[in-house]
Design a protein with these regions (language model features):
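N-terminal presequence-like segments and the immediate start of the first folded domain
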Residues: 1-71, 77-124
């Protein structure tokens, strides 16, 4: 088993890995819209979604996977009004991949967080 970290302070504080690879599977924890290099959070949901997807792509690459290997995605948004706003980012990232997907409207742990995306990838 391989554990992957992005160095986010949340990983150490909350005791989790950004991703865990086991066999042909890669489980990527929920990723919020921070630019984890600067810890800056954009205000707009679309910008947050794009940051989430960029972080996910980087994590998958470091694990030996790619976006094309994603088989499941869960989106968590704090406001259903943000759904339309993030659709362009989702269509660009997943339009050709078409993983199984769930979208949930729920609160997140910080008030500035509008979007969280979690994925599972498989190479078999």
């Amino acid at each position: 088993m391989k554990r992957i970290s992005t160095g986010s302070p949340f990983e150490a504080t909350m005791g989790y890995s950004r991703a865990v690879v086991k066999g042909g599977w890669c489980f990527v924890s929920g990723v919020t819209g921070y630019d984890y290099k600067t810890m800056v959070m954009p205000e707009k949901a679309l910008d947050q979604a794009q940051n989430c997807l960029s972080t996910i792509a980087d994590v998958l690459k470091s694990a030996g996977f790619g976006m094309q290997d994603i088989v499941r995605v869960q989106y968590t948004l704090i406001d259903r009004e943000d759904v339309e706003a993030i659709l362009p980012a989702l269509a660009t990232a997943f339009g050709d991949i078409r993983p199984a997907a769930t979208m949930v409207i729920a609160g997140l742990i910080r008030p500035e967080m509008r979007v969280e995306i979690e994925v599972t990838a498989f190479k078999g």
